[in-house]
Amino acid sequence: MRNITNFLKTFLLWELLKGLKVTGKHFFTRKVTVQYPDEKTPISNRFRGLHALRRYENGEERCIACKLCEVVCPALAITINSTEREDGTRRTSSYEIDLFKCIFCGYCEESCPVDSIVETNILEYHFEERGENIMTKAKLLAIGDKYEAQIAADRLQDKDFR
């Protein structure tokens, strides 16, 4: 009897039918795949994307060149050079972030005492030439100026968790 059962299981490809049963069960369920360029999933306001430097309302940059973000960066992706102004305050002469090194951990954003460096919701960007991965101070300020309203709204929503 056992030999007949084994023969029927082998002849009827029982294991294959069990696999097809699983496939058939999942074939008619709702799809979870998102066709990315055409459909986009919602992004949290806490998403850590492309960096930006912010300015005060009067147009002056917020960064005071304390270099805390440079020190706390685990990937050593941030490089800051500073100069002292005539009134005795320091400001950055160069601020660079190497996006190939950056791991988007958010430590730079958390450590900033004046809320100067932030990570935006921008997740789609590319580089066509060598060296474009280095975000300079001018690029970071331009991103901050362009998306300031969105950055401020996200910071306002997230204020209870800071």
UniProtKB/Swiss-Prot annotation:
Keyword Endoplasmic reticulum attributed: no
Compartment list: Cell inner membrane
Cofactor, how bound (note): Binds 2 [4Fe-4S] clusters per subunit.
SUPFAM superfamilies reported for this sequence: 4Fe-4S ferredoxins (SSF54862)
Membrane topology: Peripheral membrane protein
InterPro entries for this protein: 4Fe4S_Fe-S-bd, 4Fe4S_Fe_S_CS, NADH_quinone_OxRdtase_chainI
Subunit structure: NDH-1 is composed of 14 different subunits. Subunits NuoA, H, J, K, L, M, N constitute the membrane sector of the complex.
Cofactor(s) the protein requires to work: [4Fe-4S] cluster
Pfam families recorded: Fer4_7
Catalytic activity as recorded in UniProt: a quinone + NADH + 5 H(+)(in) = a quinol + NAD(+) + 4 H(+)(out)
Keywords: 4Fe-4S, Cell inner membrane, Cell membrane, Iron, Iron-sulfur, Membrane, Metal-binding, NAD, Quinone, Repeat, Translocase, Ubiquinone
GO cellular component: plasma membrane
Protein name (record): NADH-quinone oxidoreductase subunit I
